[in-house]
């Protein structure tokens, strides 16, 4: 019987007994990425606690530079109002103004999702939406913004608050060009708006990403990387309109809105979500390698959806995309 051979173990594959520090806590493939998170008015307490715990344990401030969301007011769009209704704004003694100020003091901008696809001139005097707008604009924080779809609302806000940044909502690019968006179309948006949320289908359009990269304007775009909708969904625009219709028709004065489950409403069979009917199809959620590919084209701002997601889902996305994988990601759920 031959003696057993001893196999040399390479120590460079063993984990260190000390955690990374500084930027070492971030995903090593995308270290300069900054993030825009769907937590405003929904996951505020959880995000504040997470940021504070991370700073205490790792002496590092995570690169979350913006949050987005909105109460269920008439101008809101993109998502239904389930979570907004579940979390009243005074649940911790906070008002919208206090929350925005807390974010701004942390170096985090706030973006309202004023992305209703069906607004007309007659909706511009909505008191609840204007109330929120006035609060946001009065903070005079350069990172605050509104995400818009309808030109009439964009023009109205630009006239009232010319210094308030505007972002192009995914709802707008879906409404304008529901099936395929061109580089020329995106260029036209860059001429009018400060920032553009890149349609999640377009994260996989390598020719378009290269054109944007070559234009030198990648810093104006914010790709959405964890969109759970079916890739190339053919009824996305119908879903957005259904949500918007529910917002407009569900208003009962100030912040009193009825809630509509637009995905499963039997009277609207044309807008039943393909995720339910065809679960075998891939979603727009990017793999880590796909995320790195977008990053390598020069994009540095990235969006995490979260307005209709539980907090655990947001933590999962932090651990998947933002954090270092060997040491830090697995600790995310312990903070």
What do these predicted regions represent?
Residues 2-182, 192-335:
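Active-site pocket-lining/capping segments in soluble small-molecule metabolic enzymes
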């Amino acid at each position: 019987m031959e003696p057993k051979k001893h196999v040399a173990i390479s120590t460079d594959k063993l984990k260190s007994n000390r955690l990374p520090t500084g930027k070492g806590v971030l995903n090593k493939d995308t270290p300069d990425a900054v993030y825009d998170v769907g937590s405003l008015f929904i996951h505020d307490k959880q995000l504040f606690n997470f940021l504070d715990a991370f700073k205490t344990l790792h002496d590092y401030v995570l690169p979350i530079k913006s949050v987005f969301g909105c109460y269920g007011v008439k101008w809101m769009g993109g998502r239904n109002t389930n979570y907004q209704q579940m979390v009243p704004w005074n649940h911790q003694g906070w008002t919208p103004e206090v929350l925005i100020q807390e974010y701004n003091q942390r170096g985090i901008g706030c973006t309202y999702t004023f992305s209703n696809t069906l607004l007309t001139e007659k909706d511009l005097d909505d008191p609840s939406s204007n109330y929120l707008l006035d609060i946001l604009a009065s903070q005079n924080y350069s990172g605050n913004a509104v995400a818009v779809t309808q030109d009439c609302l964009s023009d109205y806000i630009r006239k009232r608050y010319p210094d308030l940044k505007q972002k192009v909502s995914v709802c707008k690019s879906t409404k304008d060009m529901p099936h395929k968006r061109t580089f020329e179309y995106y260029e036209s948006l860059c001429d009018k708006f400060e920032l553009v949320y890149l349609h999640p289908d377009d994260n996989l359009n390598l020719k378009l990403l290269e054109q944007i990269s070559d234009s030198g304007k990648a810093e104006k775009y914010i790709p959405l990387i964890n969109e759970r909708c079916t890739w190339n969904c053919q009824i996305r625009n119908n879903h957005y309109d259904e949500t918007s219709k529910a917002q407009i028709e569900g208003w009962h004065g100030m912040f009193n809105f009825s809630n509509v489950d637009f995905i499963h409403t039997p009277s609207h069979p044309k807008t039943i979500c393909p995720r339910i009917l065809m679960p075998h199809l891939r979603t727009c959620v990017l793999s880590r390698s796909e995320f790195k590919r977008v990053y390598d084209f020069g994009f540095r701002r990235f969006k995490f959806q979260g307005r209709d997601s539980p907090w655990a889902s947001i933590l999962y996305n932090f651990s998947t995309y933002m954090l270092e994988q060997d040491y830090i990601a697995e600790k995310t759920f312990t903070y």
